[in-house]
Amino acid sequence: ETGKLIMPGGVDPHVHLDLPMFGTVSSDDHYTGHKAAAFGGTTTVMDFVVLEDKGFQYSVDIWMKMAEKAAIDYSFHMNLTKFDERIAKEIPSLMQMGIQTLKVFTAYNGRLRIDDGSIFRAMQIARDNGMLGMAHCENGDVIETLIPEALAAGHTTPEYHALTRPGWGAVEATMRLAAMAEQANAPVYIVHMNMAGEVDMLKYARERGVTVMG
């Protein structure tokens, strides 16, 4: 007996590699990020496909090409950052591309966020096609009010990134997504939860029989 444990490789369901965002690109690509994950004992990662105007297949092809330098196992979620009738009809095709999850945002107005009605419809479509909805939960409208106020006051140091994104907004949005999930009878996964209040919202929703995870 060696006193050591044999453990399976970890699965990280939320990474951002080769990601263009706000005029820059994330520090790791699909090789360096995978290498770092492997050193930490993670052998599978799940990244997010950025939805381009040309549709799902075009977008997935871009990210599959970038992942050709992969060092470990990987898969993708789809960022649903646009929504219209064409996109609604195409969502089921993602299953044939190996993507079974849709991520929506309640923040980043005018960039990543879609409106609540579109989120609700996407949840219904996901439900009907055996897919899982995921949500980045914050209050985008409040954030978009606080950021200009902070900039006008000269508050540009790092702590104001947090101060312009109040934690209660994440709590409120988590409850909102749980309510939509109950109404749609669809499962939802709340990503990167930070607030105790979000856990409270999940507990409340689960007690009501909602399939909500975080």
Predicted features and spans:
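Active-site loop-to-helix "anion-binding N-cap" substructures in soluble metabolic enzymes
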Residues: 48-71, 78-84, 90-93, 99, ...
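A short, structure-level motif marking secondary-structure boundaries and short turns
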Residues: 17-20, 47-49, 74-76, 106-108, ...
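Metal-associated gating/positioning segment near the N- to mid-region
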Residues: 4-69, 86
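Alpha-helix-loop-beta-strand connector modules within alpha/beta enzyme cores
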Residues: 7, 57-73, 77, 120-135
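Hydrophobic faces of well-ordered beta-strands that scaffold small-molecule active sites
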Residues: 9-15, 45-47, 74-78, 102-104, ...
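Structured loop/turn residues at secondary-structure junctions
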Residues: 22, 51, 79, 193-194
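Histidine/acidic residue-rich metal-binding segments in metalloenzymes
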Residues: 86-214
